[in-house]
Amino acid sequence: MAMTKHRKRDKQTVWLGDAEFDAELLPALTYFKRAGIQTEFSCAGVSLLDEPENHSLYAYITFITSKKTESFIEYSMERMRHRLLVTYEPSRKRYDPSSFFIGHNRRFCTLMNQYAQGFYLSQC
């Protein structure tokens, strides 16, 4: 017998400029913008408890390659260690850091917000 999945809350999105983003990554995206780090896509993912029908298995942010981006990627890899998976697409010149463990979307967002702020403040 299949279990009925009940929605706990809708996915929350906000507008930043002319693009819509997951609300849980807004602090990080704001710090990246202030630091001059260009992002292209992001997904906070949501848990099965929040959105049983339309959830993402992992959270990610796509960064356009630059010196600042590379510095942040290195900074976050040193701190997040095994919690972070980073892929690089040479043909598109972009990095895709994501949550390494399925189901750890909120922790990824919390850490990304924390390290985006720390990186930004270290650059000031």
What are the language-model segments listed below?
Residues 1-124:
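Structured alpha/beta or helical-core interaction and ligand-binding surfaces enriched in interleaved
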